[in-house]
A protein has these predicted regions:
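Structural preference for solvent-exposed beta-strand-turn elements
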Residues: 1-269
Length: 269
């Protein structure tokens, strides 16, 4: 495998996926990023077996191929290179040579066939959601996610697609945050799922202000297709508590306050 690529494009592509790589894994292959070069583009994939991110960037592919290289080390090397073209050359022993200007680095990789395969979503339930809308709903709820690992089903956000609405809920038993918005989808596509905390954070980071995200659900996994990036996550197995019963339905008194002024006052307190 051999390709040349802009340093910044290379770095952006790596950083987009490398955040899911765990530094405490017992499987060496999970410390690596999978790199596939073909058809004028390079695809990066990283996973910790619970969350997976894969993304594509343009490149000048001189020889097609696939390899896995140490993710953190590769990011560290590329981030220190000058703003110029970077050449990556990988031999049949999965040894990579990275060159940029007068700098040259050698990395030992692992065979790509040892890297976990991406799951299939052919039989998935599919939704189309505005990226900015989903990001805003996450922002308004994720702070209430429980960090108590003994309450496993609360270690994420509940996503519900019912009655023409998308509802996101998080609670730690003391606070409860709910964001609900209208969404068009077939009536038979009623669904409830719990997305883990790590996937929630990665999803918020990847979502943009414009465009649509394609959301796919199977029985135990979810996939979010955002432009040229795909995030896949396992879902939390369990039933989210009935939060509706703790939300007051009849309030005797209500107060309307200017949102901006209230926020500034709270910050000063």
């Amino acid at each position: 495998m051999k390709f040349t690529i802009s340093k910044q494009v290379f770095l952006d592509g790596l950083r987009q996926v490398a955040s899911v790589v765990s530094s405490k894994t017992t499987l060496p292959i999970l410390s690596n990023v999978k790199i596939e070069a073909e058809n004028g583009q390079v695809r990066f994939t990283a996973t910790d077996l619970d969350v997976c991110i894969t993304g594509v960037v343009p490149a000048n592919v001189l020889r097609e191929g696939t390899v896995t290289l140490p993710a953190k080390k590769l990011v560290s090397i590329i981030s220190e290179l000058p703003e110029a073209e970077v050449q990556v050359d990988v031999n049949q022993r999965n040894q990579a040579t990275v060159e940029c200007g007068r700098s040259q680095f050698k990395l030992n990789g692992l065979p790509a066939d040892e890297f976990p395969e991406l799951p299939s979503f052919e039989q998935a339930t599919v939704y189309q959601v505005d990226q900015n809308l989903l990001r805003d709903c996450i922002r308004r709820t994720e702070y209430a996610i429980s960090t108590d690992t003994t309450r496993y089903v609360l270690n994420g956000i509940s996503l519900s697609f019912r009655n023409g609405k998308m509802t996101l809920v998080a609670t730690d038993g003391r606070r409860l945050a709910l964001a609900e918005t209208a969404l068009e989808f077939p009536e038979e596509q009623q669904l409830d799922a719990i997305l883990p905390t790590k996937a929630v954070g990665e999803l918020r980071r990847l979502l943009d202000e414009v465009g649509t995200v394609t959301v796919r659900f199977t029985r135990n996994q979810a996939a979010f297709e955002i432009n040229d990036t795909l995030l896949i996550s396992k879902l939390i197995d369990g039933n989210y508590p009935n939060y509706r019963q703790v939300i007051p339905t009849d309030c005797k008194e209500s107060i309307e306050l200017p949102c901006g002024e209230l926020l500034e006052t709270v910050r000063r307190a």
